[in-house]
Amino acid sequence: MRCIECDAADVSERRERTTRGYRRFRCRACGKQFNERSGGILNRAQYPSDVIALVIFWRLRYKLSLRDLPEMFLIRGIEFSYEAVRDWEAKLTPTLIDNLRRRRTGRIGKSWYVDETYIKVNGRWCYLYRAIDRSGALVDVRLSEKRDMAAAKAFFRSAKAVTGITPARVTTDSHDSYPRAIRTELDAGVKHRTNQYLNNRIEQDHRGIKGRYGPMRGFKSHESASRFCRCFDELRNHLQARSRRSRNLPTNARRHRFSDPWDRRAPRSGSGLITGSAVSLDPPQWRDR
């Protein structure tokens, strides 16, 4: 533990804890007193970090509306409003996106399948650009108000920056913007394929966000829509069980991968997917406080 004021490592732990059970510390260098959650994105939150992390996990993983989550937690005696869920989502999802993206940098295949689907934002249809590799792993997601050359270039530029990889093959539909965008943002030597049957893989993969998007009945703003779509696909990709030859695994194997992938793949340095605070989406670290 380091001091949040002067970043000194010479800190001492105090005997007493906060009302929610967080450990307290004192910096010997500057005298600053702080606890486990000080300086983090949930520093002033009125609820335990583990409860907030579980709310956001269920919000992203399952088909629940903003009003469903408060009702589910009210049964356990935890009371909060749907506006609190919206606020927690806005605070935590950017950090979660960054952490999940860092975990898969350089691990994406070199055969990409790119397509766009429709998402309604504030009553208007927008284009959600998505890409996966041959094994079904997520490459990148980007929401755009238009379907043109600028949007295609921005998507490929973002995908290359996120993955750190230049693909060998890119399969798309026959839209006019793709050939030039691929040559400009990726490489002139990248093989571009436009067969509609070859691109059926990504079209089937749209079912994930389409199924989750249905109960929400659209988004109110472009910012919240972009943030949610990116975080949903990143978490879905992280938890999706895959085999080398087929994406269909036995039920027991899928359950094991879902309940215990964190011990093998997550860092054990005390910070989980959401760093900079005591929040962790790692299931073994969920505990009552």
Task: Describe these PLM feature segments.
Residues 21, 80-93:
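Major-groove recognition helix of helix-turn-helix-like DNA-binding domains
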Residues 42-49, 87-91, 141-164:
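Active-site beta-loop-alpha junctions of metal-dependent nucleic acid enzymes
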Residues 107-120, 130:
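Two-metal-ion RNase H-like nuclease active-site motif
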Residues 174-229, 234-237, 241, 245-246, ...:
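Helix-centered, glycine/charged polyanion-binding patches within enzymatic domains
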